[in-house]
Amino acid sequence: MSRAGSSSLANKRPRLVSHKSESPATADTPKKELVSEAQQTASAPERNSYAPTALGEVVDRAARAALARFTFGFSPTALAECYLDYATHLAWSPGKQLQLLEKAVQQCARLALHARECAIRASETEPFIHPLPQDRRFVGEPWQQWPYNLIYQSFLLQQQWWHSATTGVRGVTKQHEKAIEFAARQILDVFAPSNFLLTNPELQQHTLRQGGMNFVRGAQNLLQDWERSVSGEKPVGTEAFEVGRDVAVTPGKVIYRNRLIELMQYAPATDLVRPEPILIVPAWIMKYYILDLSPQNSLVKYLTERGFTVFMISWKNPGPEYRDVGMDDYRTFGVMAALDAVTAVVPNEPVHAVGYCIGGTLLSIAAAAMARDGDERFRSISLFAAQTDFHEAGEMMLFINESQLTFLEDMMWERGLLDGSQMAGAFQLLRSNDLIWSRTLHEYFMGQRRPMIDLMAWNADTTHMPYRMHSEYLRNLYLNNDLAEGNWLVDGKTIALTDIRAPMFVVGTIRDHVSPWRSVYKIHLLAADSEITFLLTSGGHNAGIVSEPGRKNRSYQVKTKSPTDQYADPDAWAAATPRQEGSWWPEWVSWLEKRSSEPVPPPHMGAPAAGYNVLADAPGTYVLH
């Protein structure tokens, strides 16, 4: 927990029952509060009380929660603050205004000159401005023909001009500048020529070939998607990827359950296994089975086939009754409870701990607390796309300020949670071209359903966030950066990642919009006394991690830094580290093998003598809700 104070907004808290066995013999298992003792005296977001009954605060929060339903959770005050900061500074910057005017005149002249050349030489004219490498909207041959080449290049000029207009204004707060630039980019993308029939030659040609039936099918697709959204059903095509039948099918057993997690132990796939087990702590923002998708791209299956005993946490998808469950509860009843179970099944052996995304952040917190207290049960720590320093946490920081967090907290206060669809919507905004407008063009204008794949089906299987946990996560990590600054408390005492001595394997992905790799790289500064192997792989936050051997167009860079080596900044590291082709999974497994002992017969499933009986087959029950 960080330094925030305790919440009095929820008097009823869910209670935790630890199910080591569901047999009558454990009927007298003592119940524990799901809210840890340390948390009851530690902090949640501080709030003002306007009166002894806090009636004024309740009214204010209810009003803001009602407004949030119409603004999709975005604070109008935060947006107005950004615009006012930008507009007032731009108004008092006559030099910047002249630069923008000059740039506009120059761009108009360039466009006019290009139009003249196109009129003379038609399609032989080379474009004078190119889209960014990740922008694939205008790469088709029809876009290179007149007049569409002028249309899309005019749009790119507008993008370029607005980028200049919204950045580089002296005096504007950096976060406000980024927010204004982001908002301008989102508005421009709405009016991109690729989104309209009259200005999209590829759509025109497709419509002629289809005789207009593409719009009929697109309308049907739109209606079908709307009906499913209203009814709470998953998107079309996800039924082909049923959990436990098509995905999450690696054989295993649930050996422990409490109100927050199920712990699975996977069956061995080899006659002998490494003595040191692997405990995986996935993110709870989405479901665990991204690491156990289809058999051909399951990381869990890959590990078991290479002689490892794998344990996986499956998080409960919380309801409103979990509103006062916080980050320390996820550590106590998630990571630590699972670790106790693993060390009971495989006693006297250190554990290879693995954390993905926010699960990796939580694992870092748990590891630092264990190191502080002399708990040496971790043999190694692997972090996948997991941030520990949130100072430069990418475009997610656009949504993180006091006004926005207060607005979001009030919305969650009313419901007790953050709905999974709202989280998914925020992520979609970060990649609106790929996840919103490209889909709109193909499925609703062209009438073509994109084939559903396992990763897309998993992405549609959203989860909720408890009010207290998500508030602490955003406020104490993103806003205050408490973990990196040494202000995070566990059991009332501060923790520091510098206490960790276990070797670390840290993975960043090049196109990660959630955990930018340069932010992930900062673990070098926070855990400088550990041996750190940093690997940078192609792909994004999800596809970069699910990178099975044999997949095309995959590459990575990897280098190990010992505690005595000098620090290299991210760009210097990338320039000096050679690139290797292929999946990074074999590199990681080789790293684990070097830190593991000689193979031995596999352990039994569960530990009945310690109370960890087999409760169900994997993938368990929590993942189904």
Regions found by a protein language model. Give the residues of each.
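Alpha/beta-hydrolase active-site loop
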Residues: Y322-V346
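Gly/Ala-rich beta-loop-alpha elbow adjacent to hydrolase catalytic centers
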Residues: G355-G359, L363
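Short beta-strand/loop motif that positions the catalytic acidic residue
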Residues: V506-G508, D512
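Amphipathic, low-complexity, repeat-rich surface-exposed segments
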Residues: S2-M264, P268, V273-P275, M286, ...
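Short, proline-enriched alpha-helix->beta-strand connector loops that line the catalytic pocket
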Residues: D499-M504, P516, L526-S530
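Short amphipathic alpha-helix adjacent to the substrate-entry channel of hydrolases
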Residues: D292-V310
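Conserved alpha/beta-hydrolase "acid-adjacent" motif
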Residues: H513-S519
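Alpha/beta-hydrolase-fold enzymes
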Residues: W162, T166-V216, L223, A344, ...
